[in-house]
């Protein structure tokens, strides 16, 4: 261990015989990430919880009594924050967490193991909520191939699919929040969001790693419904 420029201890992971360099770097980054350590202390399932909390602190889109849909929710960091802020734990708001992967129970959160891309997903979601959603949010990231153009197409395609789902289930005035990357929403998606929402902006919370190209698109004031 050694101290970095901030005075924190820095953990260096030794390379094992079978450990790939990428795995070593990932593990080293996790061990030295203050948000990872803080998430464990605060009882959050992932460091991503701080990203949502920070964005909501600034833009105030999560409100008591709202109905929230968390796409690609596992392991549940965003759902934890949403449940607290809309009062789902007290039965005032609702949070539906959707993922293909299983996810452990979270107080106030209803989990649905389904594919949001399936044709009947919007109908199932509305039935679970007893109506539309006030917020659809997605911290999903597409699987990468290492080929920049291919990966960009996958990223944009995933955000477009999430936006299309949101357009089917959001109440008027609703909010859509989704992970994009440095290029942000592409021109076609940006134009679509501007048609459907009163305001569209790109946000990079401080909890996003500085060496990451990760950003979020935040669209508020849904015009449809």
UniProtKB/Swiss-Prot annotation:
InterPro entries: RNA_methyltr_RlmE (IPR050082), RNA_MeTrfase_FtsJ_dom (IPR002877), rRNA-MeTfrase_E (IPR015507), SAM-dependent_MTases_sf (IPR029063). It comes from the Bacteria. Keywords: Cytoplasm, Methyltransferase, rRNA processing, S-adenosyl-L-methionine, Transferase. GO terms for cellular component: cytoplasm. Its EC number is 2.1.1.166. Coiled coil: none annotated. It is found in: Cytoplasm. Its main location: cytoplasm. Gene3D superfamilies: Vaccinia Virus protein VP39. The active site is at residue 179. It catalyses: uridine(2552) in 23S rRNA + S-adenosyl-L-methionine = 2'-O-methyluridine(2552) in 23S rRNA + S-adenosyl-L-homocysteine + H(+). S-adenosyl-L-methionine binds at residues 76, 78, 99, 115, 139. One of its GO terms (molecular function) is rRNA (uridine-2'-O-)-methyltransferase activity. Belongs to the class I-like SAM-binding methyltransferase superfamily. RNA methyltransferase RlmE family. Specifically methylates the uridine in position 2552 of 23S rRNA at the 2'-O position of the ribose in the fully assembled 50S ribosomal subunit. This is Ribosomal RNA large subunit methyltransferase E. It comes from Afipia carboxidovorans (strain ATCC 49405 / DSM 1227 / KCTC 32145 / OM5) (Oligotropha carboxidovorans). The lineage of its organism: Bacteria, Pseudomonadati, Pseudomonadota, Alphaproteobacteria, Hyphomicrobiales.
